[in-house]
Design a protein with these regions (language model features):
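A structural signal for well-ordered alpha-helical segments within the folded catalytic domains
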Residues: 16-19, 23, 73-77, 195-203
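C-terminal catalytic/acceptor-binding lobe
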Residues: 212-291
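Long, charge-rich, low-complexity alpha-helical segments
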Residues: 309, 319-382
Length: 382
């Protein structure tokens, strides 16, 4: 079994992110189950989702031993409760709520062989008593609490692919070490760090000798795209900026469900993809689809099966049986929708093939793409 799992509280800020993640999960046809872990003191009144199954867990907003308020304690705590109460078996794709899919994730992992997004720019060093696990001298206090501090570990982060059996091994220790890092580590300004759970995860995995295969799985929105080339997931932890340097989108300031201005081109492709996903969802909630522009790049959804009968083609999505017959002109349009061409460029290519003007072809192109988007066979990026 394959599970996509993310941990949340029950509040409006987490709700819109959960809805957007769920929408993108459905749009790409991600295999398996989508599970939203909800840390709550009111398990009888869980939030509502269209496709995700909500699972109530005990709230760990505050660490009981220290009184430290840090809602991210809920991540290891909720996972720990889920794996032992439900006893799932299989691969878990572990996400944060501020993630969206632009492609499905097809990789699976076996027990003892997790994979995760490489933590770009992490300055891993030589492990020693003064530099436990190589994660930095500022964590030397871990030698008082951890075993095997002389072992090196590959620095990874969300998204992660990990087997449920490995989660059972590490989640308790991950939670405990998160509390220790929050209690002991201070940055140069004397502050606790927000990323405490990320360092604690690395340390817990090192103790269990659980090395991750570092892969391109999720692009953070403040990274150079080369840090996570062709990543199927966008992690919008940081703002999207335009080529002029202006902020186009920030999760902290976004008001759902407003359209995002597309008049300024985002600096990177993943920014354009994220804005397209958000705007597509805004239109879907309103019962329509986003109008096409010449700069939109249609891309075929994964897993669509093709069957030819004479000069026609049947497209079918096995998961739900959705299907569509395409004639010869529709087939020509479909075959060009690989994400590399925008609508205008598709018109140019078809004009050359059919000896018609782009203006003559435009109605058929727009109608075909509109219908394919309606049934989820195509997605758009800017």
């Amino acid at each position: 079994m394959f599970y996509t799992v993310f941990s949340t509280n029950d509040n409006p800020y987490m709700q819109w992110q959960s809805d957007l993640l769920e929408y993108s999960w459905k749009q790409v046809g991600q295999e398996g189950e989508l599970v939203r872990l909800v840390a709550t003191d009111d398990p009888e009144n869980l939030p509502s989702q269209k496709h995700a199954r909500c699972f109530a867990t005990q709230s760990w907003d505050v660490y009981p031993e220290t009184g430290d308020a840090y809602p991210i304690y809920n991540k290891p705590a909720s996972l720990l409760e889920w794996v032992f109460r439900e006893q799932p078996e299989g691969t878990v794709l572990l996400l944060d709520p501020d993630c969206v899919f632009r492609e499905p994730v097809t990789r699976r992992v076996a027990p003892g062989f997790p994979a995760a997004q490489a933590w770009a720019g992490f300055p891993i060093g030589e492990p020693s008593m003064q530099n436990p696990f190589g994660i930095g001298a500022g964590f030397s206090f871990l030698t008082e609490h951890c075993a095997k501090v002389d072992l090196g570990i590959r620095p990874v982060m969300i998204p992660k692919l990990i087997h449920t059996r490995d989660l059972k091994r590490i989640c308790g220790r991950w939670l405990e070490l998160t509390g220790i890092v929050r209690d002991r580590f201070r940055d140069p300004a004397g502050n606790q760090i927000w990323e405490a759970d990320m360092y604690a995860y690395i340390a817990a995995c090192a103790e269990y000798d659980l090395q991750h295969d570092p892969v391109s799985l999720g692009a953070c929105t403040n990274w150079d795209p080369l840090e996570a080339p062709d990543a199927p997931i966008i992690h919008y932890c940081q703002p999207i900026v335009g080529k002029d340097g202006a902020t186009l989108f920030s999760k902290h300031r976004y008001e759902p469900w407003h359209l995002i201005d597309t008049s300024i081109e985002p600096e990177h492709e993943f920014g354009a993809d994220l804005i397209s996903i958000i705007n597509d969802y805004v239109y879907e909630r309103a019962g329509t689809v986003r109008p096409l522009s010449d700069q939109d790049r249609p891309k075929r959804a994964e897993g669509i099966m093709e069957g030819r009968v004479l000069d026609e083609m049947l497209l079918e999505r096995p998961q739900d049986g959705a299907s569509l017959w395409m004639n010869s002109s529709g087939i020509a349009i479909w075959e060009l929708c690989d994400g590399s061409l925008n609508v205008g460029e598709i018109g140019t290519k078809l004009s050359e093939e059919f000896d018609l003007t782009e203006e003559e072809l435009a109605p058929d192109i727009l109608a075909a793409i509109h219908r394919l988007r309606e049934i989820g066979f195509l997605s758009l990026s800017g």
